[in-house]
Amino acid sequence: MKYFKDIPEVKYEGPQSDNPFAFKYYNPDEIIDGKPLKDHLRFAIAYWHTFCATGSDPFGQPTIVRPWDKFSNRMDNAKARVEAAFEFFELLDVPFFCFHDRDIAPEGENLKESNKNLDEIVSLIKEYLKTSKTKVLWGTANLFSHPRYVHGAATSCNADVFAYAAAQVKKALEVTKELGGENYVFWGGREGYETLLNTDMGLELDNLARFLHMAVEYAKEIGFDGQFLIEPKPKEPTKHQYDFDSAHVYGFLKKYDLDKYFKLNIEVNHATLAGHDFHHELRFARINNMLGSIDANMGDLLLGWDTDQFPTDVRLTTLAMYEVIKAGGFDKGGLNFDAKVRRGSFELEDLVIGHIAGMDAFAKGFKIAYKLVKDGVFDKFIDERYKSYKEGIGAKIVSGEANFKMLEEYALSLDKIENKSGKQELLEMILNKYMFSE
């Protein structure tokens, strides 16, 4: 069955095109710095938002009814989603997709039935993968939707829940490996607390670390060589989540000797909820060699929740790709569109248009960022700004030679201290120049 039969295959037509079903800036085969643009960006489709979302919210019923959800049997719907998904991947010519275990196959009455459902759908996906150019960027387990996870999964107060979550991740790891996934993601939506009055934070954090170490060991056991990723988010659905932001996760991984196994999967809207620019989260991850992958979306700064909008802000995408390029590009990671159409955008074509808009925005951002990096615009300014640490007393501070007594003696010899302007306005002007002239 053709679900998108009324929508033409999406091709690159250039910035002058008015065709809503064409790329304006994303030319997948355009060679930049020796490789195609598609290999720089490594776009992925999020299975959950794209094929499972219904448009429901806490105040209203579903507004989105997809043609692949027409069956009364949940497994029939799951099989239809697979067919629709691979048609969609081909329509946009995307290289990757991402999934939760419960996105692709429904939860059963017990773990055995859930695993049976998963095996059946995985077998079907494997058949499609044989002839598809699209691969799996990452897989994960949904450890937040079912009521059993009301108090968390790895951080649950109930050891039975911990055990069930471990079994679910075990299976999800096996499935991700079976499908050729390049990464495996942990997102702790229920790993946190609502109140400290009933919480043993120390035990919960220790148990979370134990859980992750078990995952690392099992991955070695089955020969899964994909990259483990943790996705920070400060809140929602839980009041306080332990993977609050990049710095929190980095500190946690360091404390529990997990940093050698994990990198970060950073989402735009999660950075917003943590009170950070996306640029900040990426910069922190990059300078600590923790930048693994990106969940590409954006939020509404006037709202206090995760809106998961398609990323259309070119300044945001430019600064994001600047950090990715400075990090040496993606290794096993990529740009996963963890984005959903608005509740009022319920037509099938809106799904396609949303992804085109996001892919164009990141393609444009990459091209601008590449030129900024190549020209050394910000690097030159930063080198000049911090040059006092390359000679004299500054060099001694950096080398570790300086101590308080030496620095006091030096400070006493100073007549006066002169600072120079940070030139923020100039740098923002230059950024705009590159954005508008590219």
Curated annotation (Swiss-Prot):
User: Which cofactors does this protein require?
Assistant: Mg(2+)
Task: Look up the EC number in the record and give it.
Answer: 5.3.1.5
Bound cofactor: record note: Binds 2 magnesium ions per subunit.
What PROSITE patterns does the entry give? Answer: XYLOSE_ISOMERASE
Catalytic reactions of this protein: alpha-D-xylose = alpha-D-xylulofuranose
Q: Mind telling me which SUPFAM superfamilies this protein's record contains? A: Xylose isomerase-like (SSF51658)
Listed A to Z, the keywords are: Carbohydrate metabolism, Cytoplasm, Isomerase, Magnesium, Metal-binding, Xylose metabolism
Q: Which domain of life is it from?
A: Bacteria
What is one GO biological process annotated to this record? Answer: D-xylose metabolic process
Q: Name one GO cellular component term.
A: cytoplasm
Q: Does the keyword Magnesium apply?
A: yes
From the UniProt record, which GO molecular function terms apply?
magnesium ion binding; xylose isomerase activity
One family name in Pfam for this protein? AP_endonuc_2
Residue numbers binding Mg(2+): D306, D308
Where would you find this protein in the cell? Answer: Cytoplasm
Subunit record text: Homotetramer.
Per the record, the similarity remark reads: Belongs to the xylose isomerase family.
Q: Know the name of this protein?
A: Xylose isomerase
Q: Which organism is it from?
A: Caldicellulosiruptor bescii (strain ATCC BAA-1888 / DSM 6725 / KCTC 15123 / Z-1320)
